[in-house]
């Protein structure tokens, strides 16, 4: 069974990847959609043509990560494509945002991405692809967005190194450094409450 695994699939770029690939990718049997909001995943799955496995998981939670790795071990699919879109960014000066929120950002944007990639790689074959959602923030440190920019620099650097490591196996790695849409309401909603 050939599958596509998408993290952060309940909204944003993750949702968009799922919808676009569902229409245009005919060489896979199933999509595995991962996000915390299971109800949103069900809505998305209902509008897709492919079979969808819904995995309502918090990737910063060790037990939830185990659900993913155990599902892979049990079903032994061929992961044709892994798309890591799960992530978020908190706006605000470093000392103004509580440290727990910032370490949570690092956990999801970096550690979870590493763990999902590590868990999926044994099930990838030649011509499989890994797409990591970085950001244009990876290229430029940003005051007021410092932790987010640092996590995206990590994603970019990790992706470049992994691409070189996997080249002989013909597993392709792409880091997408998108700029995002400028939507003030959305950006404002990510700001720490004291800065809104």
Model features per residue range: what roles?
Residues 10-11:
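Conserved glycine-rich cofactor-binding loop
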Residues 117, 151:
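Active-site helix of classical SDR
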Residues 25-43:
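Conserved glycine-rich Rossmann-like NAD(P)H-binding loop of the short-chain dehydrogenase/reductase
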Residues 93-94, 98-106:
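Substrate-binding pocket helix/loop in short-chain dehydrogenase/reductase
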Residues 164, 168-196:
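SDR active-site lid
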Residues 85-90:
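Conserved NAD(P)H cofactor-binding loop of Rossmann-fold oxidoreductase domains
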Residues 135:
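Residue(s) in the substrate-gating loop at a strand-loop-helix junction
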